């Protein structure tokens, strides 16, 4: 049998028969298809997003909210509990801070005298102040003008400068250091019993009737001394100027002593023009003049003996409480004393007479407050 040889198969690829025109059409078709798909996606996108959002809110968020609501309720409950407790806490009144004590304020406490001649430097001043504070003192009296008329600081007044004491203290340092140590410094000034001042300026002095000689409270051979004239405006001005000086140096409280006339009522005394005003009336006017001049800037104290407070005397013309004195320091003589009941009775009677603050010095009873 005759064999015929196998014929070779011919593979035909479709692309082998693509023409240029066919390729162009195919490209255009693909481009059209892509555009159509994109357009369809653009149209469908809002609907797809709406569906996805709805699904999240209805399924996922509801689950999260249910968990967070429990936390919120717990927090809200805690906040309400805290809010409920706040009124209870705020209902307790807070303690108000105590107002600062001013230098002119009068406070309760013990008093003591200080020898100014020992206050020679800052160390001595501080040592004296600390000793007083350790003893429980509140007030410290420093005599800056004594009954001889000597002034223990550098006064700028003509009369004060002429009668400077051998020992001079630095007022500003004394006042500031005593305050730093918790004390109230009180400047003591003798008023009308001032022989040195009377001799330094005769216009301030009591004279003999019809003469230029200074009136003396005793014979010159017996140690008689002149006095300042309570009727003289120059005298009242001089004492007021001394008050102003010590206040400027830091002393907010001043004790005036010997605001009085000499005990003698001799017809030989020449007080100048009195306008018919008696002794009590003139002292009342002098005290009022100083009060008007300084007002609340300076706390003025007046020192008198127990006898001058409880009865009328030639020196005052009336009991001290009737002179318009508001702050009074009463000195009990060393020969007697007052018990607690007597002090209470004295305080009551003076308060009824118009005295606002009273300090009693009773050395025999070691009482000074």
Protein language model regions, located:
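N-terminal Lys/Arg-rich, disordered targeting/topogenic segments
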Residues: 1-27
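Substrate-binding cleft of secreted/luminal carbohydrate-active enzymes
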Residues: 45-53, 320-369
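Aromatic-lined carbohydrate-recognition surfaces of secreted/lumenal glycan-active proteins
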Residues: 186-193, 254-258, 277-315, 355-364
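Active-site-adjacent "subsite" loops/lids of carbohydrate-active enzymes
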Residues: 102-113, 117, 192-244
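Aromatic-lined substrate-binding rim segments of carbohydrate-active enzymes
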Residues: 93, 146-190, 264-298
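Hydrophobic membrane-insertion alpha-helices, especially the h-region
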Residues: 28-46
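N-terminal, intrinsically disordered, polar/charged segments of Gram-positive cell-envelope systems
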Residues: 50-107
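Catalytic domains of carbohydrate-active enzymes, especially glycoside hydrolases
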Residues: 123-151, 245-257, 320-330
């Amino acid at each position: 049998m005759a064999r015929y040889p196998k014929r070779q198969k011919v593979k035909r690829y479709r692309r082998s028969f693509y023409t240029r025109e066919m390729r162009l059409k195919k490209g255009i078709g693909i481009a059209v298809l892509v555009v159509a798909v994109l357009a369809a996606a653009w149209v469908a996108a809002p609907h797809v997003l709406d569906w996805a959002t709805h699904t999240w809110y209805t399924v996922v968020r509801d689950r999260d909210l249910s968990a967070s609501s429990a936390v919120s309720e717990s927090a809200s409950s805690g906040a309400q509990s805290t809010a409920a407790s706040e009124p209870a806490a705020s209902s307790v009144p807070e303690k108000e801070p105590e107002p600062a004590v001013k230098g002119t304020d009068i406070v309760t406490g013990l008093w003591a005298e200080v020898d100014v001649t020992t206050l020679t430097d800052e160390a001595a001043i501080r040592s004296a102040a600390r000793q007083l504070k350790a003893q429980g003192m509140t007030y410290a009296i420093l005599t800056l003008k004594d009954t001889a008329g000597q002034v223990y600081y550098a006064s700028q007044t003509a009369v004060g400068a002429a009668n400077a004491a051998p020992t001079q203290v630095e007022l500003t340092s004394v006042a500031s250091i005593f305050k730093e140590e918790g004390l109230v410094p009180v400047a003591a000034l003798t008023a009308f019993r001032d022989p040195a001042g009377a001799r330094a300026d005769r216009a301030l002095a009591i004279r003999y009737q019809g003469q230029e000689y200074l009136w003396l409270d005793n014979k010159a051979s017996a140690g008689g001394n002149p006095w300042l004239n309570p009727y003289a405006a120059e005298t009242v001005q001089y004492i007021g100027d001394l008050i102003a000086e010590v206040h400027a140096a830091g002393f907010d409280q001043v004790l005036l002593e010997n605001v009085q006339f000499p005990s003698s009522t001799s017809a030989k005394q020449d007080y100048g023009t009195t306008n018919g005003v008696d002794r009590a009336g003139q002292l009342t006017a002098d005290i009022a003049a100083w009060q008007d001049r300084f007002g609340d800037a300076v706390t003025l104290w007046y020192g008198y003996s127990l006898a001058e407070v409880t009865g009328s005397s030639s020196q005052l013309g009336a009991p001290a409480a009737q002179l318009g004195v508001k702050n009074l320091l009463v000195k009990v003589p060393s020969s007697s004393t007052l018990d607690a009941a007597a002090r209470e009775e004295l305080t009551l009677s003076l308060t009824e007479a118009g005295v606002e603050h009273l300090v009693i010095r009773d050395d025999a009873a070691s009482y000074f407050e």
